[in-house]
Amino acid sequence: MKISKKLQSPVEDGFVGVAVTTTARLHMGFFDLNGNLGRRFGSIGVSLDQPATELSAWQAKGFSAEGNGAERAIKVAKKLAKAVNLQGGMAMQLTQTIPAHAGLGSGTQMALAVGLAMDKLYDLKLNINDVAMLTGRGERSGIGLGAFAVGGVIIDGGRGKQTLIPPVIARADFPEAWRIILVFDHANSGMHGDQEVE
């Protein structure tokens, strides 16, 4: 994840914006679905260089977005703004997005990108876990959050009885010489939304 500030607003004169870039992740599975080890789920995954979501955002009076994934970005921004009682809005530009419903964590990465952009624009003092909880992300796996925060190969410790977000317990660099090839089936969409929870 990269965050940069100091973008001139194309929407409102004088507003400074932020740019957030975050990449996809592969979730390689859970290792304790029923909690026999004292924590449920626990998983391993890896962050990828591409595909990525690139979001630029500026303070605005309302909520707007342009680009692929605009509706999703607006929905997340409104949900988060309501949760923190934000009085302002956000104008967003998406120059690229992770393919939705392809098993690459596009929803989590979008939520974190929008949330961290809002945090930087309005100095909300939110961290990644705050954004995840307020947007309903990271409830079963911490891989998407770990990919956003630190990248590499990630293992999360699963959810304990008092754990809201599964913590990253191990992380390593992914060898640069190794390659991952993604093959997409554009005729079918992966499980998402309520289907994943069942």
Model regions and ranges:
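Generic structural marker for isolated residues within well-ordered, non-membrane alpha-helices
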Residues: 77, 115, 132
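Glycine/serine-rich anion-binding loops at beta->alpha junctions
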Residues: 96-120, 139-148
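ATP-dependent small-molecule kinase catalytic core of the GHMP/sugar-kinase superfamily
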Residues: 1-21, 29, 35-39, 127-198
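ATP-binding N-lobe of GHMP and related small-molecule kinases
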Residues: 1-102, 106, 119-128, 184-189
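N-terminal low-complexity, intrinsically disordered patches enriched in charged
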Residues: 38, 54, 112, 116, ...
